[in-house]
């Protein structure tokens, strides 16, 4: 038997089993990387996403080569042609691949006509394997993230004081998520100058015109494990102490606040979840950092991220087509060009995404996702857009975050109520409304904020469905304060808004 290893573009780690199991034999084992331009044509990806993935692949391939692995790097239109050639040239009889996290890619590999056995090895890049998550989920009546997170804290003994949570509580969000104060002094994100490999990828993407979405330069992301570790160290040193307090705040021109910016690297395999959690927990003990920030951050990586991955595998393929509210509006043109909206919150957030391929969680959930939800945009259209636009997007993390959390299209598998809000929330958590063409307090009239008329129209339209959720009753009781006449005006503003939209 001759073994060959195919390294996938989102598993750039020597810890994956195909590499760690064969370490002692590395000089004899052929390893292949494939950049397929056909695959990336499926989505109009942000150009910085393409640069990140291909540059990180090229760097990782060079590192393996320097470590004496027998590396082949192919740039091709598809996957099958270079694979077949390489398998034949090296007489490979068993192709080892880390099981792809994304279902569509797993299906694609299984459909390839290859003249050898394919051995999928377990993906060890999460704290909970998908089988462990499914066992946990099958043992529960309800799938609450908070229950899962507590189970993880106990299982991996993180922030524990014996059998009790450190400080006596599991969750310190009461001290987190404050509105932004004026003149906050935020840390600048750590940036990296493109090296020769990255510059070559940038030039090639410009030349080949794989996508025209998003600014390609300046490109400041890390592209190697070593650089990603610097991002983690910088976060722990400079941002972690304040992370929790302003986790949900949004400020004009402040793209990253105290957020970690580690998701692109975690999702590519350049960082491991356990090393992040350990670095943060160690800093807590060594520097006596505020527990609200430390616990709040660990909950993101150990709770939310693992939970989203688990739910993706717990659900079947049909999850991606969920549409509980039966929303079918198309994607407005301004999602592809921020200059085409005069709603300041959307304009600021979409401009930022165009410039960096990044937005923090509340910008994604409460500005972009919230707008799509209350305006009635198709969950699949908005999911496609998120998948194209964000630097850290992959199918497993998109389905759960966009279809489930953002759009509530799964009818409550993942969240107990929809994340829907009016301008009131955006005004409280940001400074966007102060500079907007619209009036944040109006839900009718010439300057009515679209977040307001869409919000009330959403509640009114889906009143019966929302009633069944129980947790929406208080919100729904406010509908009584609005007269039928006013609802007529609200719904005509919503209809008029759609009539005036250019569709992308
Ligand atoms: P921080 O705020 O510093 O958080 C730390 C880490 O926690 C993140 O890096 C991430 O690894 C993890 N995390 C926190 N929440 C989640 C979550 N809900 N799901 C998965 N991981 C989480 N995350 C992605 O990795 N890729 C995506 O494409 C993506 N799309 C999203 C779309 C929507 C509509 C929403 C609501 C959330 C999405 N998220 C996605 C989750 C979250 O917003 C990002 O992980 C986070 O903003 C990344 O920035 P950061 O590294 O600075 O995160
Ligand atoms: Fe957004 Fe409305 Fe505030 Fe303008 S007024 S920034 S549209 S929420």
Language-model region placement:
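N-terminal beta-strand-loop-alpha-helix module at the start
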Residues: 1-74
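Short His-Asn-centered micro-motif
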Residues: 6-10, 34-35, 74-77, 97-100, ...
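C-terminal catalytic domain of photolyase/cryptochrome flavoproteins
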Residues: 8-12, 249, 253-263, 268-504
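Short helix/loop capping segments that flank catalytic or ligand/cofactor-binding pockets
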Residues: 15-17, 41-43, 244, 274-276, ...
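A eukaryotic "domain-start" boundary segment
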Residues: 39, 154-265, 444-451, 463-504
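Glycine-rich phosphate/pyrophosphate-binding loops
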Residues: 68-76, 378-384
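Beta-rich, aromatic/charged-enriched effector core domains that present basic-aromatic interfaces
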Residues: 79-221, 403
